[in-house]
Swiss-Prot record:
Heterotetramer; composed of two copies of TRM6 and two copies of TRM61. It holds the Pfam family GCD14. Its EC number is 2.1.1.220. Coiled coil: none annotated. The gene is TRM61. This is tRNA (adenine(58)-N(1))-methyltransferase catalytic subunit TRM61. The lineage of its organism: Eukaryota, Fungi, Dikarya, Ascomycota, Saccharomycotina. Belongs to the class I-like SAM-binding methyltransferase superfamily. TRM61 family. S-adenosyl-L-methionine binds at S114, G115, S116, E135, R140, D163, V164, D192. GO terms for biological process: tRNA methylation. Catalytic subunit of tRNA (adenine-N(1)-)-methyltransferase, which catalyzes the formation of N(1)-methyladenine at position 58 (m1A58) in initiator methionyl-tRNA. It comes from Debaryomyces hansenii (strain ATCC 36239 / CBS 767 / BCRC 21394 / JCM 1990 / NBRC 0083 / IGC 2968) (Yeast). It catalyses: adenosine(58) in tRNA + S-adenosyl-L-methionine = N(1)-methyladenosine(58) in tRNA + S-adenosyl-L-homocysteine + H(+).
Length: 369
């Protein structure tokens, strides 16, 4: 299973993302004899083998269905098991674009965490690029390393168990095909740490000396940003800027087109039927005058009278908009127009992104001093 390639047919041992809904995606490894149990039904792994990625799979008893999706970094981000707070696609895509991460880029990442951004970096830099990622928490390091191995990403990724704030970024046993100028020689740096300002002074020995290097620090609090900016200035980084990405989803809908003439005509029709009803009641009272019943009959009728029946509004009279009826969006009997609106629940602040750049001449001058 590899995030670098795509395949059509699902085989045993493959990673499949079971799409139950926009906010409910379950990652499963296809294993013979296993079964995925959901509120939408039961789905046997044996039946998944041989199916195509993207295909809709019905439940075991014909109840419910799921879609079997091929894993991508973006889908993995919204379905992975959380070990830490993660970097979501609105932030990660902006960081990759702004730092100009492309095929062949050498990336240094501190704070592997749940591995969300590691997957995006590894996919973007391709087989020619190199990712050096660090995690200080050993259990998280072990789990992240296994995930990267299972997903075929260790071909361009080295994960290291290290506290980079105290011990730096140097790696003594770098594989030969990962070396450049006998070292890491990073082009881009991403720090997702509680105190990135303590790790910034350790970067100069592992970043490129031949090209401009970009850095992004991911910090939830503005106090962290202040300390990070001071450390960047002290170490000679320039073009420092802090941004915040606010992602909003625009939802497409169809809105029924209502003509003013039809509205006026419907109001007149309602008033006309109302007047007819009033007149009908008046006539009924006139015809019932003189009818006399025994008091006992009246009392008996009152006691045994059933509860009034509630009738559904069936849209009687002139009804050009289907009022009182179940009208499906896009129904061809009515006229529609395409509209958009912002999602009802907008995600709030995630983190501040602090960007800066180091030019080769600044780095060389600092080294000479």
């Amino acid at each position: 299973m590899s995030f670098f390639e795509y395949k059509d047919i699902i085989e045993e041992g493959d990673l499949v993302l079971a799409f139950l809904g926009r906010s409910n995606i379950k990652p499963i490894t296809v294993t013979k004899g296993s079964q995925l149990n959901t509120r939408y039904g039961n789905f046997e792994h044996d039946r998944m083998i041989g199916m195509k990625y993207g295909e809709q799979m019905p439940g075991a008893k014909g109840v419910g269905f799921i879609h079997l999706l091929y894993p991508t970094p973006e889908l993995w981000t919204v379905s992975l098991p959380h070990r830490t707070q993660i970097v979501y696609t609105p932030d990660s895509s902006y960081i990759i674009q702004r730092l100009n991460v492309t095929s062949g880029t050498r990336v240094i990442e501190a704070g592997t965490g749940s591995g969300s951004f590691s997957h995006s970096f590894a996919r973007t830099i391709g087989v020619e690029g190199r990712l050096f990622t660090y995690e200080f928490h050993e259990p998280r390091y072990i789990e992240a390393k296994k995930e990267l191995e299972d997903h075929g990403l260790l071909a361009n990724t080295v994960i290291t168990h290290r506290d980079v704030c105290n011990d730096g970024f140097e790696i003594s046993n770098i594989p030969e095909d990962f070396k450049k100028d006998d070292g890491i020689c990073g082009d881009v740096v991403f720090l997702d740490l509680p105190s990135p300002w303590t790790a910034i002074p350790n970067l100069k020995s592992v970043i490129s000396h031949q090209s401009r290097v970009g850095i992004c620090c991911f910090s939830p609090c503005i106090e962290q940003v202040e300390k990070t900016v001071k450390a960047l200035e002290t170490e000679g980084w320039s073009n420092i800027e802090m941004v915040e990405v606010a992602g909003k989803r625009w939802e497409a809908r169809k809105d029924m087109v209502k003509d003013v003439k039809d509205v006026v005509k419907r109001l007149k029709d309602i008033q006309s039927r109302k007047n007819q009803g009033i007149e009908h009641r008046k006539q009924s009272k006139i015809h019932n005058v003189g009818d006399k019943r025994d008091i006992k009959e009246v009392e008996t009728a009152d006691d045994s009278s059933p509860e009034p029946t509630k009738f559904q509004n069936l849209g009687k009279g002139f009804n050009p908009f289907g009022k009182g009826l179940r009208v499906r969006e896009g129904d061809e009997q009515f006229q529609w127009r395409n509209v958009t609106k912002i999602e009802s629940e907008i995600k709030s602040h995630t983190s501040y992104l602090t960007f800066a750049y180091m030019n080769p001449n600044v780095r060389l001058n600092t080294s000479v001093e």
